[in-house]
């Protein structure tokens, strides 16, 4: 039989105090909704339907054509949200997973186990449950003396006795699809919230003598539903530990994993060493045997094998094998550094390609440049690329030596094997094999300093 999935993503999330829909808040680099969608993929659903409501267009942009969408214009409860999927799913034979879009920690493995449990026990409904010593706020699982599930009672509707129950409802279920939509026609709003509860379907199945079961999570953390910023931070912390543990198992060394922040889609090869306070974001890829020292920040970039990045920022760029960067360097978007390039302290590179074995040791700005191989930039070199309106390109050939404190004003080209004298301002092309000197000639005026007020003779 087929599997189907319903993701509930219509809520506003008032307690988040945000203009952004709750399910779009990010955990480890992607939205909570994307985490849930990826986990749902483990059951290989034939159809996935996402229920949207508050700022539906923003939610739909995230999953685009990966799912079908239905709109819940009024948020009248989880049961009402599932009713909205009736035009797509009613009458289909199979098993339907219902899951909230604000549960980013649920794993695909747990959802697959839930479906298998449901099928193997021939249940008409199976509840994903968890156990906790602090069940406040959760719906409780009420069982009879034979441990059979009788019903789910919400916190606001629970008796004092029921509030002592430690087994809680995670808000995730599997139903026989046809029976689900038949039962939904019989639920009502006679409860403290005045809403249609999906949990009332469980009571209906029990009344008709149909089999209802519960599968208990092994890890309570997976049950976390995010309703405010506190829970969001908790989810981030748990996810970070999972991610770092995965990388350590795969051969990556962490000096302090609790102080290292790695997004879920980051790829790291074995033998990489990561010091504390390193942040790796987006689609970043790190090659084998690279070292990332304290304070390094990398986003959406590729770093090759054997590189050393020291307390520096790299954004949307590529760094080849054996490159050294930093400390205190900034590689800005759309830059590429060839093999064995050295970018030293207080060097900024923006929108530039730099050939292999080129060195910019300190205090240099390289912007909108095409730089060849074996180039040396002296300290204080500035490429001037902006005239206040337009940006221009500088082309520097192979084996060029640029003396310290030079200013290269684009658009200009320095030919292969050329040399720029220290302190020069270059405004014209420099031919290959030429030396360019663009500075004022030094003049010494003997004894002139004795006329100045700061001279010891005048004190």
Curated annotation (Swiss-Prot):
It catalyses: alpha-D-glucosamine 1-phosphate + acetyl-CoA = N-acetyl-alpha-D-glucosamine 1-phosphate + CoA + H(+); N-acetyl-alpha-D-glucosamine 1-phosphate + UTP + H(+) = UDP-N-acetyl-alpha-D-glucosamine + diphosphate. Pathway: Nucleotide-sugar biosynthesis; UDP-N-acetyl-alpha-D-glucosamine biosynthesis; N-acetyl-alpha-D-glucosamine 1-phosphate from alpha-D-glucosamine 6-phosphate (route II): step 2/2; Nucleotide-sugar biosynthesis; UDP-N-acetyl-alpha-D-glucosamine biosynthesis; UDP-N-acetyl-alpha-D-glucosamine from N-acetyl-alpha-D-glucosamine 1-phosphate: step 1/1; Bacterial outer membrane biogenesis; LPS lipid A biosynthesis. GO terms for molecular function: glucosamine-1-phosphate N-acetyltransferase activity; magnesium ion binding; UDP-N-acetylglucosamine diphosphorylase activity. Residues 251-459 are annotated as: N-acetyltransferase. The keyword Acetylation does not apply. The active site is at residue 362. Keywords: Acyltransferase, Cell shape, Cell wall biogenesis/degradation, Cytoplasm, Magnesium, Metal-binding, Multifunctional enzyme, Nucleotidyltransferase, Peptidoglycan synthesis, Repeat, Transferase. Residues 230-250 are annotated as: Linker. Mg(2+) binds at residues 102, 227. Residues 1-229 are annotated as: Pyrophosphorylase. Its EC number is 2.7.7.23, 2.3.1.157. It is found in: Cytoplasm. It is an enzyme of class 2 (transferase). Homotrimer. This is Bifunctional protein GlmU. It comes from Streptococcus pneumoniae (strain ATCC BAA-255 / R6). The gene is glmU.
């Amino acid at each position: 039989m087929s599997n189907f999935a319903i993701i509930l993503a219509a809520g506003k999330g008032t307690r988040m105090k945000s203009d952004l829909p709750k399910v779009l808040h990010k955990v480890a680099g992607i939205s909570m909704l994307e985490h849930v969608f990826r986990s749902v993929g483990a059951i290989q659903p034939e159809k996935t339907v996402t229920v949207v409501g508050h700022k539906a267009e923003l939610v739909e942009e995230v999953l685009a054509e990966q799912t079908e969408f239905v709109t819940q214009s009024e948020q009248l409860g989880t049961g009402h949200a599932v009713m909205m999927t009736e035009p797509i799913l009613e009458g289909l034979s199979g098993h339907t997973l219902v899951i909230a879009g604000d549960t980013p920690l649920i794993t695909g493995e747990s959802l697959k186990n839930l479906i298998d449990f449901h099928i193997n026990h021939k249940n008409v409904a199976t509840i994903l449950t968890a156990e906790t010593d602090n069940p406040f706020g959760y719906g409780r699982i009420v069982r009879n003396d034979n441990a059979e599930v009788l019903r789910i009672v919400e916190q606001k509707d629970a008796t004092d006795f029921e509030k002592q129950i430690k087994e809680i409802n995670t808000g995730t279920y599997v139903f026989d699809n046809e029976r689900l939509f038949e039962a939904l026609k019989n639920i009502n709003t006679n409860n403290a919230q005045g809403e249609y509860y999906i949990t009332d379907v469980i009571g209906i199945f029990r009344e008709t003598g149909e089999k209802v079961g519960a599968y208990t999570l092994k890890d309570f953390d997976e049950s976390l539903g995010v309703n405010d910023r506190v829970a969001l931070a908790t989810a981030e912390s748990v996810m970070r530990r999972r991610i770092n543990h995965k990388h350590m198992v795969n051969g990556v060394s962490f000096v302090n994993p609790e102080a290292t922040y790695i997004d879920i889609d980051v790829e790291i090869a074995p033998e990489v060493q990561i010091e504390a306070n390193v942040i790796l974001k987006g689609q970043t890829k790190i090659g084998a045997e690279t070292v990332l020292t304290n304070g390094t920040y990398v986003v959406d970039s590729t770093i090759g094998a054997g590189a050393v990045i020291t307390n520096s920022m790299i954004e949307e760029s590529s760094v080849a094998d054996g490159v050294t960067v930093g400390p205190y360097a900034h590689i800005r978007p759309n830059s590429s550094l060839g093999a064995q390039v050295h970018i030293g302290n207080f060097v900024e590179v923006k929108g530039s390609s730099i050939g292999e074995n080129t060195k910019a040791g300190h205090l240099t700005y390289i912007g909108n440049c095409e730089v060849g191989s074996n180039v040396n930039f002296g300290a204080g070199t500035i490429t001037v690329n902006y005239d206040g309106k337009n940006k221009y390109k500088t082309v520097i050939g192979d084996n060029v030596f640029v003396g310290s404190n030079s200013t290269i004003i684009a658009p200009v080209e320095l030919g292969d094997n050329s040399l720029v004298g220290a302190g020069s301002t270059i405004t014209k092309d420099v031919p290959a094999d030429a030396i360019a000197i663009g500075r004022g000639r030094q003049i010494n005026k003997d004894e002139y300093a004795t006329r100045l007020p700061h001279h010891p003779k005048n004190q």
